[in-house]
Amino acid sequence: MSGRDFGYVIQSSAALWNRLSTFSQRGKALDTRLADIKKALGKPYYETSDVLLYHGDSLELLKSMPQQIFDLTVTSPPYNIGKEYEGVLSIEEYISWCETWMSRVHRATSAGGAFWLNVGYVPVPNQGKAVPIPYLLWDKSPFYMIQEVVWNYGAGVASRKSFSPRNEKFLWYVRDPLNYYFDLDSVRDPNVKYPNQKKNGKLKCNPLGKNPTDVWQFPKVTSGAKRSSVERTAHPAQFPSAVIERVIKACSPSDGVILDPFLGSGTTSLTARKQGRCSVGIEIREDYLDIAVGRLEAEAQSLF
């Protein structure tokens, strides 16, 4: 190990120790935050020491949420394309609806917190067949946008009159562009340490691995008798846990509280638990909440 690499390891270890040493100080604050949420929203549909799930309309529940309570929100709202689990609004109504709930998420986000929004494509009458929803929403919240991340999921629906769609977008926002949590080292790719770059005749690299870039390669959660994903549930638009894991690791502290106001099948809460974070989920459909509860219970049982 070179002197520079050794110094980097020492600095990284010191940073880790500083985070660990503050855990006990923030532990009480964590309990207080969860208690404040229960006081504001009432009895949860499901509750454990690290998960609160609520059944109801996100727009209404977010209105009652305490201010600056969450370190990270990561969610995927309905895309407004008429799937069986969502209604269809006009484009103007959909944008207005998103503006409202995003402003309420902003109010509930901590000073150093982040908001990750996953959205796909929507037809716009007389203008476009598949308009990326980020083009309609990117500046419709009080947050500051850091970056667009492209999720390339590989397999998908084939198309005869256009290129087959193989990606969705994540928009990464923060409350304060000068002070936000970001732990790049926790999500570096350790299998790519030596890219083909040199400086002064020496390889440029980080000993922990490569920055994963803004294009993420993760397979979609698939269905079907021969190709169904292991984590597949009855929800028709399910997040892969690997995507959410990267977001949680990079953009929330180890004792953070995470929100998903459109919880669906519970992937955000399940992944947050596996990463040692607490979470709050809101879902309007009780059958999806029951799926989420079942996944959380199964994961808890697997630990014994």
UniProtKB/Swiss-Prot annotation:
Pfam families: N6_N4_Mtase
Superkingdom of this protein's organism: Bacteria
EC code(s) of this entry: 2.1.1.113
Keywords: DNA-binding, Methyltransferase, Restriction system, S-adenosyl-L-methionine, Transferase
MF annotations from Gene Ontology: DNA binding; N-methyltransferase activity; site-specific DNA-methyltransferase (cytosine-N4-specific) activity
Entry keyword Methyltransferase: yes
Top-tier EC class: transferase
Biological processes, Gene Ontology terms: DNA restriction-modification system; methylation
InterPro entries referenced in this protein's UniProt entry, alphabetically: DNA_methylase_N4/N6 (IPR002941), MeTrfase_CN4_CS (IPR017985), RM_Methyltransferase (IPR001091), SAM-dependent_MTases_sf (IPR029063)
Catalytic activity: a 2'-deoxycytidine in DNA + S-adenosyl-L-methionine = an N(4)-methyl-2'-deoxycytidine in DNA + S-adenosyl-L-homocysteine + H(+)
Family from the record: Belongs to the N(4)/N(6)-methyltransferase family. N(4) subfamily.
Official protein name in the record: Type II methyltransferase M.ScaI
Organism this protein belongs to: Streptomyces caespitosus
Top-level taxonomy: Bacteria, Bacillati, Actinomycetota, Actinomycetes, Kitasatosporales
